[in-house]
Structure formats: structure tokens, C-alpha cells
């Protein structure tokens, strides 16, 4: 029952949703829901080891989008019931997802868009960052619209703020347009200002 989905495909969650859960084996997925107006609301990210599926959520308009190519494993409810090791693994990953969701809720409560974007970048640095000689590189390429949807603002505003951060030397982009957090100043500011750490 394992599966492969190419980057961007958003209907993974529709497969066998009432019988069990998916686990990311390789790749990164974005978890979201749609508002009544059709806007995307970010719920978090699923990395290798993360479990997801409609069986684990009350959200009706649950969506899963591959930020990279996804390799997934499928587990039925009976698999979880019969394996203490698998159940413990699922519990550990769900606890991590809960912390991630709490951080996103804290970000959404910040009044200034600039603060929301800074805290989102800091969370991305923690969750999806990898160390390089230039700084911390976000492992997936996020569009300005992705970031705007995550903090309830416009793409134009995100583009303007990213330009300001880049001029201030806080971040940059690699040749594939992945965000790179380049400055200790950004890390220190974000950590001291964040109310979810």
C-alpha cells in the first residue's frame, strides 16, 4: 500500500482515509485546510517519520501538498493496534506535530505582519532547516504566496518584507531560490521575540 506522489499533488489525503494513516518515508509535505472563502490555512509540515491522515483530524477540508516528491507508507488501524513500536512512533510524531501547530497558532496571534513573517521564518529554520556554509537553508522551495498564506497577508507584502530582510543581511537565496537564513542577528532577534519557545 505504499505510494509515491510527485511534488505539488494535493489529493494524497483522499486515499483510504478512513482505514488508517500515512507516514512520510521520504520528502516533505505541507498540511493545510481550506477556509469557507477558499483560502489555504497552514496546519504544519510533514517530514520523514511524520504520520498524517483524515483519521487523525477533525478538519473536513484537510489537504496535503507535496513540497517535494513524496514517498509514503500506509498503515491500517490493525497495524497500529498490533505493534507497540509503531504505536509509540506514531505518538511521538503526533506530539511533535502538536508543538508545531501551537507555534503556528502563536504566530497567527502576532499583530504586526513583519513579526509574523520573522517568526514563521524562525520556525521554518527550526523545522526544515539544514546547515550550510552560507547559513541555514530551508530544505524546500517556498513561494512568496506559500509564506503569505501561512501568515494571512498578501504576496506583495511578503515580497517587500523579504527584500527588506535581505537588504538588512538577515537572509538570502541560493541558486534554486531556497531561503537561507544568513545572520546570527536574525536568530537572536527571533528567539528573544518568539513566545512559543
What are these regions (language model features)?
Residues 127-197:
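Phosphate-/nucleic-acid-contacting segments
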Residues 11-21, 39-40, 58-60, 135:
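A short beta-loop-beta micro-motif enriched in histidine and acidic residues
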Residues 23, 66, 180-181:
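Conserved hydrophobic "DFG−1" position in protein kinase catalytic cores
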Residues 88-153:
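Polybasic "coupling" helices that flank or enter modular domains
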Residues 19-32, 48-49:
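Glycine- and acidic-residue-biased ligand/ion/polar-headgroup-sensing regions
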Residues 29-41:
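A short beta-strand-loop-beta hairpin characteristic of the jelly-roll/cupin
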Residues 42-99, 103:
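Cyclic-nucleotide recognition modules
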Residues 2-13:
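Single conserved hydrophobic/aromatic residue that forms the stacking wall/gate
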Amino acid at each position: 500500500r505504499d505510494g509515491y506522489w510527485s511534488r505539488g499533488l494535493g489529493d494524497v489525503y483522499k486515499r483510504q482515509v478512513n482505514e488508517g494513516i500515512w507516514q512520510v518515508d521520504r520528502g516533505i509535505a505541507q498540511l493545510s485546510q481550506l477556509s469557507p472563502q477558499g483560502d489555504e490555512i497552514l496546519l504544519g509540515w510533514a517530514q520523514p517519520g511524520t504520520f498524517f491522515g483524515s483519521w487523525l483530524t477533525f478538519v473536513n477540508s484537510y489537504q496535503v501538498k507535496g513540497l517535494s516528491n513524496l514517498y509514503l507508507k500506509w498503515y491500517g488501524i490493525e497495524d497500529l493496534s498490533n505493534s507497540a513500536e509503531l504505536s509509540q512512533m506514531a505518538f511521538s510524531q503526533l506530539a511533535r506535530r502538536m508543538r508545531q501547530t501551537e507555534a503556528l497558532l502563536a504566530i497567527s496571534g502576532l499583530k504586526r505582519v513583519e513579526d509574523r513573517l520573522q517568526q514563521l521564518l524562525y520556525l521554518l529554520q527550526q523545522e526544515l532547516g539544514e546547515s550550510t556554509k552560507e547559513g541555514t537553508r530551508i530544505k524546500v522551495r517556498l513561494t512568496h504566496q506559500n509564506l503569505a498564506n501561512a501568515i494571512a497577508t498578501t504576496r506583495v507584502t511578503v515580497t517587500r518584507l523579504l527584500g527588506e530582510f535581505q537588504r538588512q543581511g538577515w537572509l538570502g537565496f541560493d541558486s534554486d531560490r531556497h531561503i537561507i537564513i544568513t545572520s546570527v542577528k536574525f536568530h537572536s532577534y527571533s528567539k528573544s521575540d518568539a513566545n512559543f519557545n
